[in-house]
């Protein structure tokens, strides 16, 4: 459950702890703005992304389906700083059972909009698709830049973290996996 009042109090305390005056003109509304922002960027905590995959269609298609370059924005749970990038989702329908393409993007967003680790995010997307659609295989790749590596600490802007989760036929069959990676890279 989202507690806007508690977040506002916490932001006020942080501002005081860094030596700022939360009552000065530029900061007066900041605790409320931050609370509203957190409600938006952590909205995935209020949903079950699997629900986006309830609608399944029967099609004469048992070949690879890829939705690539899905923009994603999340918050690293270690420093509460953003990471952002792209998700690529591939699956091979079993017996022609497909879902709407936008539903795959909604699953990505539902898991991204919460405190996250990129590795977990990648697996959660793949496991949810595998569980709900029961496809022959699923492959998820996420490429993201982490502000905790860009803005602080090691300060390496432009560095990207790439994670993958490979399930079913994509894990078992090297050629199928290679085809998916090639299509994701745009080398079809």
Swiss-Prot record:
GO terms for cellular component: cytoplasm. The keyword Nucleotide-binding applies. Pathway: Cofactor biosynthesis; 7,8-dihydroneopterin triphosphate biosynthesis; 7,8-dihydroneopterin triphosphate from GTP: step 1/1. The keyword GTP-binding applies. SUPFAM superfamilies: Tetrahydrobiopterin biosynthesis enzymes-like (SSF55620). One of its GO terms (molecular function) is GTP cyclohydrolase I activity. It catalyses: GTP + H2O = 7,8-dihydroneopterin 3'-triphosphate + formate + H(+). It is an enzyme of class 3 (hydrolase). Zn(2+) binds at residues 76, 79, 148. PROSITE patterns: GTP_CYCLOHYDROL_1_1 (PS00859), GTP_CYCLOHYDROL_1_2 (PS00860). CDD domains: GTP_cyclohydro1. One of its GO terms (biological process) is tetrahydrofolate biosynthetic process. Its EC number is 3.5.4.16. Keywords: GTP-binding, Hydrolase, Metal-binding, Nucleotide-binding, One-carbon metabolism, Zinc. Transmembrane segments: none annotated. Belongs to the GTP cyclohydrolase I family. Homomer. HAMAP family: FolE. This is GTP cyclohydrolase 1. It comes from Pelotomaculum thermopropionicum (strain DSM 13744 / JCM 10971 / SI).
């Amino acid at each position: 459950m989202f507690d806007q009042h508690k977040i506002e109090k916490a932001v006020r305390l942080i501002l005081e702890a860094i030596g700022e005056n939360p009552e000065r003109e530029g900061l007066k509304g900041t605790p409320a703005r931050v609370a509203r922002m957190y409600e938006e960027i952590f909205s995935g905590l209020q949903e079950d992304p699997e629900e986006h995959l309830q609608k399944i269609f029967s099609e004469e298609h048992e070949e690879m389906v890829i939705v690539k370059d899905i923009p994603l924005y999340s918050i690293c749970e270690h420093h509460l700083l953003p990471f952002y990038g792209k998700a690529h989702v591939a699956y091979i329908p079993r017996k022609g059972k497909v879902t709407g393409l936008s539903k795959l993007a909604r699953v990505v967003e539902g898991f991204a909009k919460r405190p996250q680790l990129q590795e977990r995010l990648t697996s959660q997307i793949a496991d949810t698709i595998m569980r709900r659609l029961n496809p022959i295989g699923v492959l998820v790749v996420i490429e993201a830049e982490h502000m905790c590596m860009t803005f602080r600490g090691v300060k390496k802007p432009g560095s990207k973290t790439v994670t993958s989760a490979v399930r079913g036929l994509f894990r078992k069959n090297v050629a199928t996996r290679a085809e998916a990676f090639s299509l994701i890279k745009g080398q079809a």
